[in-house]
C-alpha cells in the first residue's frame, strides 16, 4: 500500500479528500504543520507528500527545503491558494513534482497522485496493450507492396515502438518486435535492390536522396538577408536521432522528415552527395582524380569546395558559405569561437560532427567500446551522453536562440551486424566490410548481397573492365576465406555501414526553429 503524507493547517476541512484517497487504497497520514510532518518523515518514509504552501509558522517552501534535505527523492505536490505566477515559478524552480491550486476536488488530487505514483506502471500496461494490437496488423502487412513513402512510415513506426517498449521495460515484446523488424528489413532490401537503379537514373516518383538535401531542404531557408546553420552528425541512425530530440525540444520546435542515403551508405559517397548535390560519376567529372578505391578518407577532402559550388548553383548567387569539420574537442572549441561571427551575418554555416562515426568505427577495434556499446540501446545512450555535453548542442542552441534556423541531418546510419558472408575476390578490392568493388568478385551466397557489374546502377564513374560491385544486405558483413574464423570473431556484433538496410538508408532531416 502506497503511503501519503498530507500537510495542511486546515487539514480538518480536508476529511472528505482523505477518506476518498483511503477508499482508493492509499494509506494517508495527515498533520496540520511542518514540524509534525518532519517528525513523521524521520520515523518512516513516504511515497508522496502533499504540502500546503501557506501555513502559520514555517511556510510550505521552508518545510519543502527541509524535506528535501531529509529525503531528496520523495515526490512533493505543492498545494496553495495563490494563483500568482511567482509562487508557481518558485515551486517549479525548486523541483516540486506538481502544483495544485485550492480549492481542489478529491478527483484532482487522485489524478495527480496516480500519475506520480502509478503513471509508469499504467503507461507500461498501455504500451504493452497497444503494441500487442498493432503487432497483429504489422505482422499481417509484412509482405504487402510498399513504396518509398510507406517504407519511411513503417520504419519510423518500428523505431518509435522500440523506444517506447524499451522505456516501458517490455523486454519480451522487444524480442517480438526484433523478429518483426528482421522480416521487414528483408523486404526493404528487396525493394531497394529492385528500385534503386531507377531512383538514381531519373526514374519517376523517387524518394528524396542525399543529393536532394540542399535543394529540397536547405535552399528554401537561404536568401540574401538570411542566416542558416546546417549541421551534419555523421553516422546517426533514426533511433539515435529520436533519442536526441528530447534534449532539443525544450528550446526548439522540431519538424522532422526522412530521406534515403545513396549507396554505398558510407561517408565517401553519401556525405559527398549531400555537399555536392551530385552522384559519384558527376563528382568525378568535376574533380579529376577524385575517384579511387584506396584511401577513402581522401575522398571527402573537397566537401567545402563542393558545398560552395552547389549553393551557388542552386541559389544562382554567391552567398557567404562557411564550412567546418569537428573531429575532436579542440576542433569544437575553435569552431565555437568562430561561430558567433558567422551567425551574425547572412549566409550558411555547415558543420560536420564526426563523433558518432568515430564511436561506431572505434567500437570494432576496442574491446572496451565493444563492451560499453554492446547493443542498440547502449549505442543510443552513449550518443545521448555525448550530445548533452557536445559542441554540437552548444552550436545548435546558440543558433536557435538567436532566431537562426538550423537544419540537422546525417549522411548515413549503421547496422548491428551478426552474419558473416564469404566473398571471393582478387586483392585489389575495397576494404569496407559492407561493400566491395573489384575484379572477379562474387559472394558465396548470392542472397547476402546486391551484385552488379554495371556502374550506371550506382552512378559510379566508368571503371576498369570486369569490375564487380557487391553491397551487403540486412545484417551481413563480408569476410574472405583466408583468416575466416579470425574475422568472423572480430567483427561479429559490430555496428557497420555501407550496405542496404533501413537502419543505414532511412535517415532524419530536421528543421529546428526557436520556440
Residue ranges and their predicted role:
Residues 39, 61-72:
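Short amphipathic alpha-helix used as the core "switch/output" element in two-component signaling
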